[in-house]
Curated annotation (Swiss-Prot):
One of its GO terms (biological process) is lipoprotein biosynthetic process. This is Phosphatidylglycerol--prolipoprotein diacylglyceryl transferase. Catalyzes the transfer of the diacylglyceryl group from phosphatidylglycerol to the sulfhydryl group of the N-terminal cysteine of a prolipoprotein, the first step in the formation of mature lipoproteins. PANTHER family: PHOSPHATIDYLGLYCEROL--PROLIPOPROTEIN DIACYLGLYCERYL TRANSFERASE, PROLIPOPROTEIN DIACYLGLYCERYL TRANSFERASE. The lineage of its organism: Bacteria, Bacillati, Bacillota, Bacilli, Bacillales. Belongs to the Lgt family. It is an enzyme of class 2 (transferase). The chain crosses the membrane at residues 19-39, 56-76, 92-112, 116-136, 178-198, 206-226, 236-256. Keywords: Cell membrane, Membrane, Transferase, Transmembrane, Transmembrane helix. It is found in: Cell membrane. It comes from Bacillus cereus (strain ZK / E33L). It comes from the Bacteria. A 1,2-diacyl-sn-glycero-3-phospho-(1'-sn-glycerol) binds at residue 138. Its EC number is 2.5.1.145. It is a multi-pass membrane protein.
Length: 270
């Protein structure tokens, strides 16, 4: 697709009759499938049946999407109160990661209790998969030309040595913008490598998941400061508040669980 003289990628991957299939959904789905593959592979190594994570994903993903949308709509209620028909329209974006994470954790706790397995063990195994899904998912925002930062010049983007297809896609309504989707995606990919390395350290059970929360939240806090479409509560950026809260809560949980003897098992123990 061309916008002026700048070639850009079409957010629609394929048109099936009257129904457009957006890259956003394809990319999110790809992230889920790759994350599932990673989790089932590690789960089998640690004695978790393959169908455990398949069943969990089939339940958790729809609930996470529901929570992600609810979270987004709540903080954009002024718009959706005037446009209620758009509340269920998620084909072009409008999913908040923090909302999805809340839904996934609640589902994971209930699922683990029903299956009679440790939630912390499942959470540790799933942590790199979740972050991988988030890293891939940000490219859906790229295709939608959303979740970007403030205005910049083309020269600034070229100075980052970015490929032309990224630079061109950051040209929106006559202006170039910070590719904050890329900053967060790269941070998340680095986090996946870190978490995979920490598996070999054999941390106490639950601490790999808390490391994920801390790592993601630190990156999200700084990237959010560059964005122009943040969900707001008065003067506060909701994602930054949530990020600070998750870091603090994670550190407290690590300390308290150790002191109370609730972190007695290691990552690889049955």
């Amino acid at each position: 697709m061309l916008l002026g003289s700048v070639p850009q990628l079409d957010r629609v991957a394929v048109q099936l009759g009257p129904f457009p299939v957006y890259w956003y959904g394809i990319i999110i789905g790809t992230g889920v499938l790759l994350g599932l593959w990673l989790a089932t592979r590690e789960g089998e190594r640690l004695g978790i049946p393959k169908d455990t994570f398949v069943d969990l994903v089939l339940i958790a993903v729809p609930i996470a999407i529901l929570f992600a949308r609810m979270y987004y709509v709540i903080f954009e209620w002024e718009y959706y109160a005037q446009n209620p028909s758009q509340i269920i329209n998620i084909r072009q974006g409008g999913l908040a990661i923090h909302g999805g994470l809340i839904g996934a954790v609640i589902t994971g706790i209930l699922f683990a209790k029903r299956r009679g397995v440790s939630f912390w063990k499942l959470a540790d195994i799933a942590a790199p998969s979740i972050l991988l899904g988030q890293a891939i998912g940000r490219w859906g925002n790229f295709m939608n030309q959303e979740a970007h930062g403030d205005e910049v010049t083309r020269q600034f983007l070229e100075g980052l040595h970015l490929p032309d297809f990224i630079i061109n896609q950051m040209y929106i309504d006559g202006v170039y913008y910070h590719p904050t989707f890329l900053y967060e995606s790269l941070w998340n990919f680095a986090g996946v490598i870190l978490l995979l390395a920490l598996r070999k350290v054999n941390l106490r059970r639950g601490e790999l998941f808390f490391t994920y929360l801390i790592w993601y939240s630190i990156g999200r806090f700084f990237v959010e400061g560059l964005r122009t479409d943040s969900l707001m509560l008065g003067p506060l950026r909701i994602a930054q508040v949530m990020s600070i809260g998750l870091v603090v809560i994670s550190i407290i949980f690590i300390i308290v669980r150790r002191k109370m003897g609730q972190a007695d098992k290691r990552y690889s123990e049955n």
